[in-house]
Structure formats: structure tokens, C-alpha cells
């Protein structure tokens, strides 16, 4: 059992016998009212999203999820097929099931992901916190602009855009932090 104040992004709770992923949790305490937790939840089985406000003392059921290592095997339209690295079983997910990691999923990637199962059904995939991707396009460096941390837009092979350091060029391998939508960490070593 969890209480409302223990909710944080990534936590999975049970509501009406379905697993719900906490995507956002905002704790609020005012002088007059009791503490509350405003949450954005996603049903892991149906993809339905909702917002619910919990009291800090509300009791919520935990969900036991199984996790296995998996790699992306191939992409066919909006269907992504992942392979369990231990027994080579194939599992399919739609693009909407993995929309939070979709900007960093690309054909031929070798990253080992964490496949998340609820009652033997694949419900989502989590990427490692740091991944390496190649810059497909970026503008040239701005000469003389060295007053601070200078960033410029760049595009990855799958079309994802993010800000990178000014010295990054086309073809460079960069590290990306996949938490909170993804951000540039540095040049890959």
C-alpha cells in the first residue's frame, strides 16, 4: 500500500483492477487545507489518460510488475517488435504504448531496454537513462559566440530534434538523458 504523498512519476498503482502509471505528480500543501497530490495517470492496458487529485493520506494499492531485458527487433509501420534477450520471445507494442520513449527509438538501435509486464502482458518499454545517438543534421557553429553555454538545434536519424552544444557537428555521436523527455548530456566517448 502506498499513500497519496508517496506517488511520484514512474510509480504504478491499481485502480479498478487496472494498472495505472503515474506520469506526473505535484504535491501541494496550503495553510488551510490538507496536503494533496495532483497526478496525471495513464492506464497501461488501454492507454487512457486522466488526472486525479489524492489526499496525502489516501491509501492506494501497489502493482507488481515483471521486468525483463529486451532489445528492439524491428519496426513495421506503427508496430514495434521487441525480443526478450533471455529466451528470444517476440513481443509487439503499438507506437501509442511507448510514446514517452518513441523519440529515441530507431531502427537498428542496440540499446538493451527494460520490458515491463503486467500479468504476462507487455505494457511498456523503458530505455536506459543514457543512450548514444548520431546527429543527422545541425547548423554550423556560430563564430565568436563563446560568452556561455551556447546551444543549437540538431536532428537525429529518426527525426527527433533537441538542443546540443555549439561544437557538435553532423555525424557526431552524442549522449542523451532519456528521463523527462530527453536532453543533451555531452559528446559520446
UniProtKB/Swiss-Prot annotation:
Its cellular-component GO annotations read: cytoplasm
| UniProt entry keywords in alphabetical sequence | Cytoplasm, Elongation factor, Protein biosynthesis
Keyword match Zinc:
no
Pathway given for this chain reads:
Protein biosynthesis; polypeptide chain elongation
The primary location reported for this protein is: cytoplasm
So which domain of life are we looking at?
A: Bacteria
Record InterPro entries = Elong-fact-P_C, NA-bd_OB-fold, Rib_uL2_dom2, Transl_elong_fac_P/YeiP, Transl_elong_KOW-like, Transl_elong_P/YeiP_cen, Transl_elongation_fac_P, Translation_prot_SH3-like_sf
Could you cite one Gene Ontology molecular function of this protein?
translation elongation factor activity
Q: Where in the cell is it found?
A: Cytoplasm
Q: Which Pfam families match?
A: EFP, EFP_N, Elong-fact-P_C
Q: Which GO terms describe its biological process?
A: peptide biosynthetic process
Give the SUPFAM superfamilies listed for this entry. Nucleic acid-binding proteins, Translation proteins SH3-like domain
Describe the family membership recorded for this protein in Swiss-Prot or TrEMBL: Belongs to the elongation factor P family.
Role description: Involved in peptide bond synthesis. Stimulates efficient translation and peptide-bond synthesis on native or reconstituted 70S ribosomes in vitro. Probably functions indirectly by altering the affinity of the ribosome for aminoacyl-tRNA, thus increasing their reactivity as acceptors for peptidyl transferase.
UniProt-listed HAMAP family = EF_P (MF_00141)
Q: What is this protein called?
A: Elongation factor P
Which organism does this sequence originate in?
Answer: Pseudomonas syringae pv. syringae (strain B728a)
Amino acid at each position: 500500500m502506498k499513500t497519496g504523498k508517496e506517488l511520484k512519476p514512474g510509480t504504478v498503482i491499481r485502480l479498478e483492477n487496472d494498472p495505472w502509471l503515474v506520469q506526473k505528480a505535484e504535491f501541494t500543501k496550503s495553510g488551510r487545507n490538507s496536503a494533496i497530490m495532483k497526478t496525471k495517470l495513464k492506464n497501461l492496458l488501454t492507454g487512457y489518460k486522466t488526472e486525479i487529485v489524492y489526499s496525502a493520506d489516501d491509501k492506494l494499492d501497489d502493482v507488481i510488475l515483471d521486468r525483463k531485458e529486451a532489445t528492439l527487433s524491428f519496426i513495421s509501420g506503427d508496430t514495434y517488435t521487441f525480443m526478450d534477450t533471455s529466451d528470444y520471445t517476440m513481443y509487439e507494442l503499438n507506437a501509442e504504448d511507448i510514446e514517452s520513449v518513441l523519440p529515441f527509438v530507431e531502427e537498428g538501435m542496440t540499446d538493451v531496454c527494460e520490458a515491463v509486464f503486467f500479468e504476462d502482458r507487455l505494457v511498456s518499454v523503458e530505455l536506459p537513462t543514457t543512450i548514444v545517438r548520431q546527429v543527422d543534421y545541425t547548423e554550423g557553429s556560430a563564430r565568436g559566440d563563446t560568452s556561455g553555454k551556447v546551444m543549437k538545434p540538431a536532428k537525429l536519424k529518426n527525426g527527433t530534434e533537441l538542443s546540443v552544444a555549439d561544437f557538435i557537428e553532423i555525424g557526431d555521436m552524442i549522449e542523451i538523458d532519456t528521463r523527462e523527455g530527453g536532453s543533451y548530456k555531452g559528446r559520446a566517448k
